[in-house]
Each structure stands twice: as structure tokens, then as C-alpha cells.
Swiss-Prot record:
Enzymatic reactions: a deoxyribonucleotide-2'-deoxyribose-5'-monophosphate-DNA + H2O = a 5'-end 2'-deoxyribose-5'-monophosphate-DNA + a 3'-end 2'-deoxyribonucleotide-DNA + H(+); Exonucleolytic cleavage in the 3'- to 5'-direction to yield nucleoside 5'-phosphates; a 3'-end 2'-deoxyribonucleotide-3'-phosphoglycolate-DNA + H2O = 2-phosphoglycolate + a 3'-end 2'-deoxyribonucleotide-DNA + H(+); a 3'-end 2'-deoxyribonucleotide-8-oxoguanine-DNA + H2O = 8-oxo-dGMP + a 3'-end 2'-deoxyribonucleotide-DNA + H(+)
Disulfide bonds: 65-93
Biased composition (Basic and acidic residues): 16-38
Location of the region described as Necessary for interaction with NPM1 and for efficient rRNA binding in the Swiss-Prot/TrEMBL record: 23-33
Sites marked Cleavage: 31-32
Protein name stated in the entry: DNA repair nuclease/redox regulator APEX1
Organism this protein belongs to: Pongo pygmaeus (Bornean orangutan)
Taxonomic lineage of the native organism: Eukaryota, Metazoa, Chordata, Craniata, Vertebrata
Pfam family, one: Exo_endo_phos
Keyword vocabulary terms for this entry: Acetylation, Activator, Cleavage on pair of basic residues, Cytoplasm, Disulfide bond, DNA damage, DNA recombination, DNA repair, DNA-binding, Endonuclease, Endoplasmic reticulum, Exonuclease, Hydrolase, Magnesium, Metal-binding, Mitochondrion, Nuclease, Nucleus, Phosphoprotein, Repressor, RNA-binding, S-nitrosylation, Transcription, Transcription regulation, Ubl conjugation
Length: 318
């Protein structure tokens, strides 16, 4: 996720975080009220009803959810598990867990059916990064990382192989405030692309998680103000495009909803960004093209609270 700012810094929507004079605040509030009264309020996203059949009419047989929880323990305190129980996925993928496996909250054992649980976290950085994969069905095989030491120190990738597909959940490195990790991010993108291409050559692939990039201008509220910010630099967008082409993979949400605006999965905690829907689409389900005939729906659960990201859900008819 894009890093949170400080007072006087540039915010995720491109505005400078300043304290306005009271007179200016009053005028701004009045203008806002006038706009909302005229039906010109925040542009919100309404998740349409779930489509649970494939293009050929086959009913969905698999439901996968992915959520950047921004800290597993805090997310549980914010009732994130209540949403999971209601959504009832077959597989749940979590990113930015910030929790080592030996300190996992006991509440995770209460999740109905998701008894096969796999976790990865940095060995030397408590409270940083981390991913989890929880499944009803036992995978054929589970592995961790992408097989390159430089990129496997931060607990960012879990791979689970099932009968008809391989699932990868990832928390892709952020380029950082001031783009201090952009060069590393570019090396990661190249290595990750090679790794995924190898997986996809053997079995259809599903990649999900916080990929830390808004691919196109439609995927964030203020593209013009963020072209030099982490998550929307030309280098990151190009890297994402190369990933789609080289593996190859399809963006499941844009495949189904190519022109749907205001569909975001991340909002900074600052400046009431979520209530205004000033957000970014950073979380994805990417699929091998051979799985598109099985694609029923790709959902953004924007009303689910508990993190600065919202969960996303994929339906497949396998």
C-alpha cells in the first residue's frame, strides 16, 4: 500500500496535507454541502450482485478471497474474522499480516472449515510484511518465496498447488515514500515475472494479493497527482503490463468490468479518503487465460471494514 504521509507531505490523492485557515474551511464546507445537495457528492462504488455461473452457465465451484489486513491482530480486533465467516470462502489469502507464525492469534483456529493454514513472515523483522493462506482443501504442495534469496527474506509469497490450478498469494514490495525502493521493486518485478512464467507453464495460475500498483488511470482517483508516487510510477505500471503479457495473465476484474470507474481496494487513513472514495485499486486476481472460461465473477467488497484495504473475492467454475 502507498505509505501514509505526514503533515505538509503529499497525500495519496496528490493534495498537500495542510491545515486550512478557518475562513477557507467554512467556504470549502459550504461548497461541499452545496455539491452534495445537488447530487454531486463523493463518487462511490457499488459492488453489483455476485455472478455465480461461468460464461457457459456452469455453476461456481470455488470461492477465493484475498485481503491485505494491515496487521493480523488489529484486523481481528476490528472484527475482520466476522466478515470472513459470513463470506465463507473456500480459500482465504491474507497479506501484510505483520505476525510471525509462533504468535498467531488463537481466533484463527475458529474459522469454519479453513483448517489448512500456511504462513510466511520475515525471520528478522517482527511486525513487518507477512502473508497467509488458509484453505478448506489440503493443497497438493505448498512452497514459500520465489526461489531467489534477495527476494525471499520478507515473507511475501506463498504458492499452493491444487488439482487443476496453482494459487500464488503475494504482498509485492512498495517502492516507498520518495521512491527509495523503486530500484529494488524493479528487480523484484523482473524476478517475480520469471517465477510466475515458470509456474504457469506447468499448470493454470491464479495470482492474488496486494500487488502495490494501480495499472491504469481508471484504477485510482487522482492519476495526475500521483505519477511520481509509489504505486503509480511509469516503471511500476510498465512492470505490471509486462507481467500480464509475459506470463501471460488476465486481470479478472477488468476482464469483466473494463470501464467501471471508482472501483478501489485501498484508501489512506488520512483526510477521510475512504468516505470520499479517494482510493487506489492495488489488489488483484490475475488468471491464466485458460481459466477465463471458468471465471464467474471478480468482486470488490468495498464496504467491508477492518483495514485500509478491502477484501476482494473470485468465483471460478472448475
Amino acid at each position: 500500500m502507498p505509505k501514509r504521509g505526514k503533515k505538509g507531505a503529499v497525500a495519496e490523492d496528490g493534495d498537500e496535507l495542510k491545515t486550512e485557515p478557518e475562513a477557507k474551511k467554512s467556504k470549502t464546507t459550504a461548497k461541499k454541502n452545496d455539491k452534495e445537495a445537488a447530487g454531486e457528492g463523493p463518487a462511490l462504488y457499488e459492488d453489483p450482485p455476485d455472478q455465480k455461473t461461468s460464461p457457459s452457465g456452469k455453476p461456481a465451484t470455488l470461492k477465493i478471497c484475498s485481503w491485505n489486513v494491515d496487521g493480523l491482530r488489529a484486523w481481528i480486533k476490528k472484527k475482520g474474522l466476522d466478515w470472513v465467516k459470513e463470506e465463507a470462502p473456500d480459500i482465504l489469502c491474507l497479506q501484510e499480516t505483520k505476525c510471525s507464525e509462533n504468535k498467531l492469534p488463537a481466533e484463527l483456529q475458529e474459522l469454519p472449515g479453513l483448517s489448512h493454514q500456511y504462513w510466511s513472515a520475515p525471520s528478522d523483522k517482527e511486525g513487518y510484511s507477512g502473508v497467509g493462506l488458509l484453505s478448506r482443501q489440503c493443497p497438493l504442495k505448498v512452497s514459500y518465496g520465489i526461489g531467489e534469496e534477495e527476494h525471499d527474506q520478507e515473507g511475501r509469497v506463498i504458492v499452493a498447488e491444487f488439482d487443476s490450478f496453482v494459487l500464488v498469494t503475494a504482498y509485492v514490495p512498495n517502492a516507498g515514500r520518495g521512491l527509495v525502493r523503486l530500484e529494488y521493486r524493479q528487480r523484484w518485478d523482473e524476478a517475480f515475472r520469471r517465477f510466475l512464467k515458470g509456474l504457469a507453464s506447468r499448470k493454470p495460475l491464479v495470482l492474488c494479493g496486494d500487488l502495490n500498483v494501480a495499472h491504469e488511470e481508471i484504477d485510482l482517483r487522482n492519476p495526475k497527482g500521483n505519477k511520481k508516487n509509489a504505486g503509480f510510477t511509469p516503471q511500476e505500471r510498465q512492470g505490471f503490463g509486462e507481467l500480464l503479457q509475459a506470463v501471460p495473465l488476465a486481470d479478472s476484474f477488468r476482464h469483466l468490468y473494463p470501464n467501471t470507474p471508482y472501483a478501489y481496494t485501498f484508501w489512506t487513513y488520512m483526510m477521510n479518503a475512504r468516505s470520499k472514495n479517494v482510493g487506489w485499486r492495488l489488489d488483484y486476481f490475475l488468471l491464466s487465460h485458460s481459466l477465463l472460461t471458468a471465471l464467474c465473477d471478480s468482486k470488490i467488497r468495498s464496504k467491508a471494514l477492518g483495514s485500509d484495504h478491502c477484501p476482494i473475492t473470485l468465483y471460478l467454475a472448475l
